Protein backbone atom coordinates (compact mmCIF):
# COMPACT_ATOMS: atom_id res chain seq x y z
CA UNK A 1 0.00 0.00 0.00
CA UNK A 2 2.99 2.28 -0.32
CA UNK A 3 2.51 5.73 -1.70
CA UNK A 4 -1.13 5.17 -2.49
CA UNK A 5 -3.55 8.03 -2.43
CA UNK A 6 -6.53 8.18 -0.15
CA UNK A 7 -8.76 7.49 -3.14
CA UNK A 8 -7.02 4.21 -4.03
CA UNK A 9 -7.43 2.25 -0.81
CA UNK A 10 -10.02 -0.51 -1.41
CA UNK A 11 -11.85 0.08 1.88
CA UNK A 12 -12.29 3.83 1.50
CA UNK A 13 -15.37 5.55 0.16
CA UNK A 14 -15.18 6.63 -3.45
CA UNK A 15 -15.00 10.42 -3.64
CA UNK A 16 -16.70 11.27 -6.94
CA UNK A 17 -17.82 14.79 -6.04
CA UNK A 18 -21.28 13.68 -4.93
CA UNK A 19 -22.63 13.74 -1.39
CA UNK A 20 -21.70 10.50 0.41
CA UNK A 21 -24.95 8.95 1.59
CA UNK A 22 -25.52 7.54 5.04
CA UNK A 23 -25.68 3.76 4.65
CA UNK A 24 -28.09 1.25 6.18
CA UNK A 25 -25.17 -0.12 8.19
CA UNK A 26 -24.73 3.26 9.86
CA UNK A 27 -28.45 3.60 10.59
CA UNK A 28 -28.46 0.10 12.09
CA UNK A 29 -25.42 1.03 14.19
CA UNK A 30 -27.30 4.06 15.57
CA UNK A 31 -29.98 1.82 17.09
CA UNK A 32 -27.56 0.83 19.84
CA UNK A 33 -27.32 4.50 20.74
CA UNK A 34 -31.09 4.84 21.04
CA UNK A 35 -30.78 2.32 23.85
CA UNK A 36 -27.70 4.04 25.29
CA UNK A 37 -29.44 7.43 25.46
CA UNK A 38 -32.44 5.78 27.15
CA UNK A 39 -30.13 4.20 29.71
CA UNK A 40 -28.46 7.52 30.42
CA UNK A 41 -31.72 9.40 30.95
CA UNK A 42 -33.00 6.68 33.29
CA UNK A 43 -29.70 6.71 35.18
CA UNK A 44 -29.93 10.46 35.70
CA UNK A 45 -33.61 10.27 36.70
CA UNK A 46 -32.91 7.68 39.40
CA UNK A 47 -29.80 9.50 40.67
CA UNK A 48 -30.86 13.13 40.56
CA UNK A 49 -28.18 14.52 42.85
CA UNK A 50 -24.75 16.14 42.32
CA UNK A 51 -22.94 12.80 42.30
CA UNK A 52 -25.47 11.30 39.91
CA UNK A 53 -25.11 14.26 37.56
CA UNK A 54 -21.31 13.89 37.43
CA UNK A 55 -21.58 10.14 36.89
CA UNK A 56 -24.10 10.56 34.08
CA UNK A 57 -21.96 13.26 32.50
CA UNK A 58 -18.92 10.96 32.43
CA UNK A 59 -20.96 8.09 31.00
CA UNK A 60 -22.55 10.39 28.40
CA UNK A 61 -19.16 11.50 27.11
CA UNK A 62 -18.05 7.86 26.89
CA UNK A 63 -21.15 7.04 24.85
CA UNK A 64 -20.64 10.09 22.64
CA UNK A 65 -16.93 9.44 22.05
CA UNK A 66 -17.60 5.84 21.05
CA UNK A 67 -20.13 7.04 18.50
CA UNK A 68 -18.05 10.02 17.34
CA UNK A 69 -14.84 8.10 16.62
CA UNK A 70 -16.83 5.45 14.74
CA UNK A 71 -18.58 8.19 12.78
CA UNK A 72 -15.22 9.43 11.49
CA UNK A 73 -14.32 5.88 10.44
CA UNK A 74 -17.50 5.53 8.39
CA UNK A 75 -16.92 8.96 6.86
CA UNK A 76 -13.61 7.80 5.42
CA UNK A 77 -14.28 4.08 4.99
CA UNK A 78 -17.09 2.44 3.06
CA UNK A 79 -19.50 0.65 5.46
CA UNK A 80 -20.77 -1.51 2.58
CA UNK A 81 -17.44 -3.29 2.16
CA UNK A 82 -17.49 -6.62 4.06
CA UNK A 83 -14.54 -5.84 6.35
CA UNK A 84 -15.81 -2.41 7.42
CA UNK A 85 -19.34 -3.78 7.79
CA UNK A 86 -17.95 -6.49 10.06
CA UNK A 87 -16.08 -3.86 12.05
CA UNK A 88 -19.27 -1.83 12.52
CA UNK A 89 -21.16 -4.90 13.76
CA UNK A 90 -18.35 -5.73 16.21
CA UNK A 91 -18.42 -2.15 17.50
CA UNK A 92 -22.21 -2.42 17.82
CA UNK A 93 -21.86 -5.47 20.05
CA UNK A 94 -19.33 -3.72 22.27
CA UNK A 95 -21.58 -0.65 22.38
CA UNK A 96 -24.59 -2.77 23.35
CA UNK A 97 -22.69 -4.38 26.23
CA UNK A 98 -21.40 -0.97 27.33
CA UNK A 99 -24.90 0.56 27.27
CA UNK A 100 -26.32 -2.41 29.18
CA UNK A 101 -23.72 -1.88 31.92
CA UNK A 102 -24.49 1.84 32.37
CA UNK A 103 -26.72 1.40 35.47
CA UNK A 104 -23.91 -0.44 37.29
CA UNK A 105 -20.94 1.37 35.78
CA UNK A 106 -20.06 3.03 39.09
CA UNK A 107 -20.85 -0.16 40.96
CA UNK A 108 -20.04 -3.81 40.44
CA UNK A 109 -20.35 -3.68 36.64
CA UNK A 110 -17.68 -1.06 36.17
CA UNK A 111 -15.21 -3.56 34.75
CA UNK A 112 -17.80 -4.77 32.19
CA UNK A 113 -18.47 -1.21 31.08
CA UNK A 114 -14.74 -0.53 30.78
CA UNK A 115 -13.84 -3.70 28.89
CA UNK A 116 -16.62 -3.05 26.37
CA UNK A 117 -15.62 0.59 25.95
CA UNK A 118 -11.90 -0.12 25.63
CA UNK A 119 -12.57 -2.93 23.15
CA UNK A 120 -14.71 -0.53 21.12
CA UNK A 121 -12.24 2.37 21.06
CA UNK A 122 -8.88 0.60 20.96
CA UNK A 123 -10.05 -2.36 18.89
CA UNK A 124 -11.65 -0.26 16.17
CA UNK A 125 -8.71 2.15 15.94
CA UNK A 126 -6.10 -0.63 15.93
CA UNK A 127 -7.95 -2.50 13.20
CA UNK A 128 -8.11 0.57 10.95
CA UNK A 129 -4.42 1.34 11.57
CA UNK A 130 -3.58 -2.25 10.62
CA UNK A 131 -5.71 -2.14 7.46
CA UNK A 132 -4.08 1.11 6.35
CA UNK A 133 -0.54 -0.21 6.68
CA UNK A 134 2.52 1.98 7.28
CA UNK A 135 2.49 4.23 4.21
CA UNK A 136 -1.07 5.36 3.61
CA UNK A 137 -1.68 9.13 4.09
CA UNK A 138 -4.20 8.42 6.87
CA UNK A 139 -1.98 5.90 8.67
CA UNK A 140 -0.01 8.39 10.76
CA UNK A 141 -3.23 9.99 11.99
CA UNK A 142 -4.60 6.62 13.10
CA UNK A 143 -1.33 5.68 14.83
CA UNK A 144 -1.52 8.89 16.85
CA UNK A 145 -5.18 8.28 17.58
CA UNK A 146 -4.36 4.73 18.70
CA UNK A 147 -1.75 6.13 21.06
CA UNK A 148 -4.24 8.46 22.72
CA UNK A 149 -7.08 5.94 23.06
CA UNK A 150 -4.53 3.50 24.54
CA UNK A 151 -3.45 6.09 27.12
CA UNK A 152 -7.12 6.65 27.89
CA UNK A 153 -7.69 2.87 28.12
CA UNK A 154 -5.11 2.59 30.91
CA UNK A 155 -7.04 5.20 32.90
CA UNK A 156 -10.39 3.51 32.22
CA UNK A 157 -9.07 0.13 33.35
CA UNK A 158 -7.38 1.58 36.44
CA UNK A 159 -10.62 3.33 37.36
CA UNK A 160 -12.57 0.08 37.26
CA UNK A 161 -10.53 -1.31 40.16
CA UNK A 162 -10.59 1.61 42.61
CA UNK A 163 -13.21 3.11 44.89
CA UNK A 164 -15.96 5.42 43.73
CA UNK A 165 -14.37 8.88 44.03
CA UNK A 166 -11.07 7.74 42.53
CA UNK A 167 -12.98 6.01 39.73
CA UNK A 168 -14.78 9.23 38.88
CA UNK A 169 -11.49 11.14 38.80
CA UNK A 170 -9.64 8.61 36.62
CA UNK A 171 -12.53 8.25 34.20
CA UNK A 172 -12.91 12.02 33.93
CA UNK A 173 -9.23 12.32 32.95
CA UNK A 174 -9.70 9.47 30.46
CA UNK A 175 -12.59 11.38 28.89
CA UNK A 176 -10.45 14.50 28.62
CA UNK A 177 -7.72 12.53 26.83
CA UNK A 178 -10.11 11.44 24.10
CA UNK A 179 -12.16 14.62 23.90
CA UNK A 180 -9.32 17.15 23.94
CA UNK A 181 -6.53 15.33 22.07
CA UNK A 182 -8.13 15.81 18.60
CA UNK A 183 -8.18 19.57 19.24
CA UNK A 184 -4.37 19.48 19.21
CA UNK A 185 -3.95 16.88 16.45
CA UNK A 186 -3.32 13.85 18.70
CA UNK A 187 0.27 15.00 19.46
CA UNK A 188 2.69 12.28 20.60
CA UNK A 189 6.49 12.24 20.93
CA UNK A 190 8.02 10.55 17.92
CA UNK A 191 4.74 10.50 16.01
CA UNK A 192 4.20 14.23 15.58
CA UNK A 193 0.73 15.71 15.31
CA UNK A 194 -2.07 15.70 12.76
CA UNK A 195 -3.40 18.78 10.99
CA UNK A 196 -7.10 19.24 10.41
CA UNK A 197 -6.31 19.98 6.77
CA UNK A 198 -5.17 16.34 6.51
CA UNK A 199 -8.59 15.12 7.65
CA UNK A 200 -10.10 14.86 4.19
CA UNK A 201 -13.65 14.20 5.34
CA UNK A 202 -16.88 14.30 3.36
CA UNK A 203 -18.47 17.28 5.11
CA UNK A 204 -22.08 16.70 4.12
CA UNK A 205 -21.98 13.13 5.41
CA UNK A 206 -20.51 14.18 8.76
CA UNK A 207 -23.13 16.90 9.23
CA UNK A 208 -25.89 14.42 8.42
CA UNK A 209 -24.53 11.92 10.95
CA UNK A 210 -24.62 14.58 13.68
CA UNK A 211 -28.16 15.48 12.66
CA UNK A 212 -29.22 11.84 12.89
CA UNK A 213 -27.90 11.61 16.44
CA UNK A 214 -29.98 14.65 17.36
CA UNK A 215 -32.98 12.75 15.97
CA UNK A 216 -31.99 9.77 18.14
CA UNK A 217 -31.93 11.98 21.26
CA UNK A 218 -35.20 13.74 20.43
CA UNK A 219 -36.77 10.37 19.63
CA UNK A 220 -35.75 9.04 23.03
CA UNK A 221 -37.37 12.11 24.59
CA UNK A 222 -40.65 11.23 22.89
CA UNK A 223 -40.30 7.56 23.89
CA UNK A 224 -39.80 8.58 27.52
CA UNK A 225 -42.80 10.90 27.34
CA UNK A 226 -44.99 8.17 25.88
CA UNK A 227 -43.82 5.56 28.39
CA UNK A 228 -44.50 7.87 31.35
CA UNK A 229 -47.91 8.74 29.94
CA UNK A 230 -48.74 5.05 29.52
CA UNK A 231 -47.91 4.40 33.19
CA UNK A 232 -50.17 7.21 34.45
CA UNK A 233 -53.12 5.73 36.36
CA UNK A 234 -55.48 8.59 35.54
CA UNK A 235 -55.44 10.65 32.35
CA UNK A 236 -56.93 13.79 33.83
CA UNK A 237 -56.56 17.40 32.66
CA UNK A 238 -53.23 18.04 34.45
CA UNK A 239 -51.66 14.90 32.96
CA UNK A 240 -52.90 15.76 29.46
CA UNK A 241 -51.67 19.33 29.94
CA UNK A 242 -48.26 17.98 30.99
CA UNK A 243 -48.19 15.80 27.86
CA UNK A 244 -48.89 18.83 25.68
CA UNK A 245 -46.24 20.93 27.43
CA UNK A 246 -43.52 18.29 27.08
CA UNK A 247 -44.43 17.54 23.46
CA UNK A 248 -44.36 21.22 22.49
CA UNK A 249 -41.01 21.63 24.24
CA UNK A 250 -39.57 18.72 22.25
CA UNK A 251 -41.08 20.16 19.07
CA UNK A 252 -39.45 23.53 19.81
CA UNK A 253 -36.05 21.84 20.19
CA UNK A 254 -36.56 20.05 16.88
CA UNK A 255 -37.46 23.34 15.17
CA UNK A 256 -34.49 25.20 16.63
CA UNK A 257 -32.17 22.60 15.13
CA UNK A 258 -33.76 21.27 11.96
CA UNK A 259 -36.10 24.09 11.05
CA UNK A 260 -33.63 26.94 11.26
CA UNK A 261 -30.05 25.77 10.65
CA UNK A 262 -29.48 22.14 9.61
CA UNK A 263 -29.30 22.77 5.84
CA UNK A 264 -27.03 25.76 6.31
CA UNK A 265 -24.80 23.69 8.60
CA UNK A 266 -24.39 21.06 5.89
CA UNK A 267 -23.49 23.79 3.40
CA UNK A 268 -21.02 25.39 5.84
CA UNK A 269 -18.99 22.24 6.38
CA UNK A 270 -19.18 21.20 2.72
CA UNK A 271 -17.90 24.55 1.43
CA UNK A 272 -15.24 25.04 4.10
CA UNK A 273 -11.57 25.23 3.08
CA UNK A 274 -10.82 23.08 6.13
CA UNK A 275 -13.76 20.67 6.55
CA UNK A 276 -11.79 18.57 9.04
CA UNK A 277 -11.59 21.49 11.48
CA UNK A 278 -15.29 22.34 11.10
CA UNK A 279 -16.23 18.66 11.39
CA UNK A 280 -14.30 18.28 14.65
CA UNK A 281 -15.88 21.50 15.93
CA UNK A 282 -19.35 20.15 15.10
CA UNK A 283 -18.69 17.05 17.17
CA UNK A 284 -17.51 19.04 20.19
CA UNK A 285 -20.65 21.18 19.99
CA UNK A 286 -23.08 18.30 19.57
CA UNK A 287 -21.84 16.63 22.75
CA UNK A 288 -23.15 19.70 24.62
CA UNK A 289 -26.32 20.16 22.59
CA UNK A 290 -27.43 16.53 22.84
CA UNK A 291 -26.56 16.47 26.53
CA UNK A 292 -29.15 19.23 26.91
CA UNK A 293 -31.74 17.08 25.13
CA UNK A 294 -31.08 14.17 27.51
CA UNK A 295 -31.40 16.41 30.58
CA UNK A 296 -34.63 17.89 29.18
CA UNK A 297 -36.04 14.38 28.73
CA UNK A 298 -35.52 13.77 32.45
CA UNK A 299 -37.35 17.01 33.27
CA UNK A 300 -40.21 15.98 30.99
CA UNK A 301 -40.50 12.68 32.84
CA UNK A 302 -40.80 14.49 36.17
CA UNK A 303 -43.47 16.88 34.86
CA UNK A 304 -45.58 14.05 33.48
CA UNK A 305 -45.19 11.71 36.45
CA UNK A 306 -45.78 14.30 39.21
CA UNK A 307 -47.54 17.36 37.72
CA UNK A 308 -48.89 18.62 41.06
CA UNK A 309 -45.71 18.17 43.11
CA UNK A 310 -43.77 21.18 44.39
CA UNK A 311 -40.25 21.56 43.08
CA UNK A 312 -37.24 20.33 45.00
CA UNK A 313 -33.93 21.97 44.23
CA UNK A 314 -32.88 18.98 42.11
CA UNK A 315 -36.08 19.35 40.05
CA UNK A 316 -35.47 23.07 39.56
CA UNK A 317 -31.93 22.44 38.37
CA UNK A 318 -32.88 19.76 35.83
CA UNK A 319 -35.91 21.66 34.48
CA UNK A 320 -33.85 24.81 33.94
CA UNK A 321 -30.48 23.27 33.06
CA UNK A 322 -31.78 20.93 30.34
CA UNK A 323 -33.27 23.62 28.06
CA UNK A 324 -30.50 26.10 28.99
CA UNK A 325 -27.72 23.67 27.99
CA UNK A 326 -29.58 22.93 24.77
CA UNK A 327 -29.91 26.63 23.94
CA UNK A 328 -26.23 27.25 24.71
CA UNK A 329 -25.21 24.31 22.52
CA UNK A 330 -27.52 25.53 19.77
CA UNK A 331 -26.07 29.05 20.04
CA UNK A 332 -22.49 27.78 19.68
CA UNK A 333 -23.59 25.59 16.77
CA UNK A 334 -25.13 28.56 14.96
CA UNK A 335 -22.03 30.61 15.69
CA UNK A 336 -20.05 27.95 13.80
CA UNK A 337 -22.54 28.04 10.92
CA UNK A 338 -23.33 31.77 10.62
CA UNK A 339 -20.47 33.42 12.51
CA UNK A 340 -22.88 35.13 14.93
CA UNK A 341 -24.30 34.07 18.29
CA UNK A 342 -28.12 34.38 18.02
CA UNK A 343 -29.42 36.92 20.53
CA UNK A 344 -32.68 34.97 20.90
CA UNK A 345 -30.80 32.05 22.44
CA UNK A 346 -29.05 34.24 24.99
CA UNK A 347 -32.37 35.87 25.89
CA UNK A 348 -33.83 32.38 26.30
CA UNK A 349 -31.03 31.28 28.63
CA UNK A 350 -31.45 34.46 30.70
CA UNK A 351 -35.22 33.89 30.91
CA UNK A 352 -34.67 30.32 32.12
CA UNK A 353 -32.29 31.51 34.83
CA UNK A 354 -34.86 34.11 35.93
CA UNK A 355 -37.39 31.30 36.36
CA UNK A 356 -35.34 29.73 39.17
CA UNK A 357 -36.86 31.78 42.04
CA UNK A 358 -40.32 31.41 40.48
CA UNK A 359 -39.96 27.63 40.45
CA UNK A 360 -40.17 27.36 44.24
CA UNK A 361 -43.62 28.98 44.20
CA UNK A 362 -45.23 26.75 41.55
CA UNK A 363 -45.73 23.05 40.83
CA UNK A 364 -43.96 20.87 38.25
CA UNK A 365 -46.70 21.31 35.65
CA UNK A 366 -46.54 25.11 35.78
CA UNK A 367 -42.75 25.06 35.62
CA UNK A 368 -42.90 22.66 32.69
CA UNK A 369 -45.11 25.07 30.81
CA UNK A 370 -42.90 28.06 31.64
CA UNK A 371 -39.76 26.39 30.28
CA UNK A 372 -41.68 25.26 27.19
CA UNK A 373 -42.90 28.81 26.58
CA UNK A 374 -39.28 30.01 26.66
CA UNK A 375 -38.28 27.40 24.06
CA UNK A 376 -41.28 28.29 21.89
CA UNK A 377 -40.39 31.99 22.10
CA UNK A 378 -36.81 31.32 21.01
CA UNK A 379 -38.09 29.11 18.20
CA UNK A 380 -40.47 31.84 17.04
CA UNK A 381 -37.68 34.44 17.02
CA UNK A 382 -35.39 32.10 15.11
CA UNK A 383 -38.16 31.44 12.60
CA UNK A 384 -38.39 35.17 11.90
CA UNK A 385 -34.61 35.37 11.56
CA UNK A 386 -34.69 32.48 9.09
CA UNK A 387 -37.33 34.20 6.96
CA UNK A 388 -35.27 37.40 6.87
CA UNK A 389 -32.16 35.42 5.94
CA UNK A 390 -34.03 33.60 3.17
CA UNK A 391 -35.44 36.84 1.75
CA UNK A 392 -32.00 38.45 1.89
CA UNK A 393 -30.41 35.52 0.05
CA UNK A 394 -33.14 35.57 -2.59
CA UNK A 395 -32.67 39.31 -3.16
CA UNK A 396 -28.89 39.17 -3.57
CA UNK A 397 -28.78 37.81 -7.16
CA UNK A 398 -31.24 40.46 -8.28
CA UNK A 399 -28.99 43.20 -6.93
CA UNK A 400 -26.10 42.24 -9.22
Summary of predicted features, one role per range:
Residues 2-27, 32-35, 47, 57-86, ...:
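Predominantly late transmembrane helices and immediately cytosolic-facing juxtamembrane segments
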Residues 336-339, 355-368:
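Membrane-helix boundary connector in multi-pass membrane proteins
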Amino acid sequence: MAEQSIQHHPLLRRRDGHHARVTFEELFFDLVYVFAVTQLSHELLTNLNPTGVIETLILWFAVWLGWQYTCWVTNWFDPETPRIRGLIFAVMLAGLVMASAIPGAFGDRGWIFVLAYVALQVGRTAYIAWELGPDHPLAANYRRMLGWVSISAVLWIAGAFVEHEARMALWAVAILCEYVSPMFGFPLPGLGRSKTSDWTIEGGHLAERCQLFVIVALGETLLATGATMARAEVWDVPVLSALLATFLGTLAMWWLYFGTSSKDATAAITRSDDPGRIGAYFHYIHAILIGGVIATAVGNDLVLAHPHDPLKTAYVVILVAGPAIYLLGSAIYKKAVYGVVPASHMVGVAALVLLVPVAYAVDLLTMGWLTTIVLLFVGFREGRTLRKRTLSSAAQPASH
